[in-house]
Amino acid sequence: MVMNTDSLALIKNSIKTIPNYPKEGILFRDVTSLLEDPQAYKLTIGLLVEHYKDQGFTKVVGTEARGFLFGAPLALELGIGFVPVRKPGKLPRETISESYELEYGHDVLEIHVDAINAEDKVLVIDDLLATGGTIEATVKLIRQLGGSVNDAAFVISLPDLGGEQRLEKMDLKLVSLCEFEGE
């Protein structure tokens, strides 16, 4: 994706790095600082809209919880529906679920069974790509419901953690606005 380097620098510079959070040795990339900057937030959504408009998407799927913060406004600007993928027990209608591995243990995600169908071309979005486990589980849910998903967008990517390679094995085209080294 070709984008204005000044715009990308503004977005990247709006993301604060918090050392030793949530544990010693981790550099936490705090996307909430981007949300506090209306210029950076608007620019982030605008760049994603510009990249994904006119590609025939029918739904944007965002992962809990920060994926909602970028997915919902993106879907609104694209004029398509937004579908949340959530942790168990948070969605009121019938759901399907997918378990996935974390660094220490596992987690589960759910989606409404009637949220996606075989006619849907889906764009998946989350705030950050690290190991790729959350998006891998999300893509599996969408495909179980018959939806077509070949694209995933992120505000931040941490390439050292291997998520890009993991998701490319699922035939996903990935777009990240900012990359940061390390964990």
UniProtKB/Swiss-Prot annotation:
Pfam family, one: Pribosyltran
Cellular component terms per the entry's GO annotation: cytoplasm
A single MF term (Gene Ontology): adenine binding
UniProt feature coiled coil, ranges: none
Location(s), subcellular: Cytoplasm
The keyword Transferase belongs to this UniProt entry's keyword annotation: yes
CDD domains recorded: PRTases_typeI
Keywords from the named record: Cytoplasm, Glycosyltransferase, Purine salvage, Transferase
Catalysis performed (reactions): AMP + diphosphate = 5-phospho-alpha-D-ribose 1-diphosphate + adenine
Predominant subcellular localization, coarse grouping: cytoplasm
Record keyword Chaperone present: no
EC number(s) reported in the record: 2.4.2.7
Recorded metabolic or biological pathway in which this protein acts: Purine metabolism; AMP biosynthesis via salvage pathway; AMP from adenine: step 1/1
Gene Ontology terms: biological process: adenine salvage; AMP salvage; purine ribonucleoside salvage
Alphabetical list of SUPFAM superfamilies matching this protein: PRTase-like
Annotated function: Catalyzes a salvage reaction resulting in the formation of AMP, that is energically less costly than de novo synthesis.
Record note on quaternary structure: Homodimer.
Homology family: Belongs to the purine/pyrimidine phosphoribosyltransferase family.
Record PANTHER family: ADENINE PHOSPHORIBOSYLTRANSFERASE (PTHR32315:SF3)
Protein name: Adenine phosphoribosyltransferase
